[in-house]
């Protein structure tokens, strides 16, 4: 008989403020233990050096976490010029040095122009991408470097916040799959030097833009007030899906959807993902518009 997973049933999304020096998985496990939750998952890793928004999905909300993995992100990043590291950030070992040319805001702005819109990035060796079944970062730690194919990403917005000596502070709004470390290195090269990320903070992800976040200390204080106070920090799972159109279903249609059957909904959108609700406003899950005009249920949540 399979061993029953311990913990309690908790459902919702926590907007966690990850501290520096902690891996995303370690942060997840710490928060999961604090909630005593049976099931939880994060929505895409932040580098250990990075701080900021790490949405953690509990219970049924893990079924919609993939939509956040595909979402756009916003960061504030500080790039240290003149020194390159093997990891592309301050946690790595120095691998190169170069003089930093005299830079003012106008010169930096000229350098940034080529990094707005669609760009191709070469994934760093210190990344979770797999090569013949092995993570690139595992190969990198063995001193092995392999060829990587460039990947197309999009920089929706890139702004210079400040120039402070040999450091640049930038705000970045980018598509999924963008490596900020690679972006910082490429910008440094465009400015005639080398560089690495020395500070990185994620401020937004998908529908969550500049949200209130919870630190581990804040959560611990809530936990001392009891489970009800702790659970009040969670957002409903459909908060992660506000970029998609919501559709209210009549009672008979909601019944069929819950059974996993496609339904025809008059005047519903004819393409894309859709949030599905019953007449009581209860979130049923995600559906997808089908070619025949019906809505097919794809990610249903448990009925209680």
Swiss-Prot record:
GO terms for biological process: mRNA pseudouridine synthesis; tRNA pseudouridine synthesis. It catalyses: uridine(55) in tRNA = pseudouridine(55) in tRNA. CDD domains: PseudoU_synth_EcTruB, PUA_TruB_bacterial. Pfam families: TruB-C_2, TruB_C_2, TruB_N. GO terms for molecular function: RNA binding; tRNA pseudouridine(55) synthase activity. Keywords: Isomerase, tRNA processing. It comes from the Bacteria. Gene3D superfamilies: Pseudouridine synthase, PUA domain. NCBIfam families: TruB. Responsible for synthesis of pseudouridine from uracil-55 in the psi GC loop of transfer RNAs. This is tRNA pseudouridine synthase B. It comes from Halorhodospira halophila (strain DSM 244 / SL1). The lineage of its organism: Bacteria, Pseudomonadati, Pseudomonadota, Gammaproteobacteria, Chromatiales.
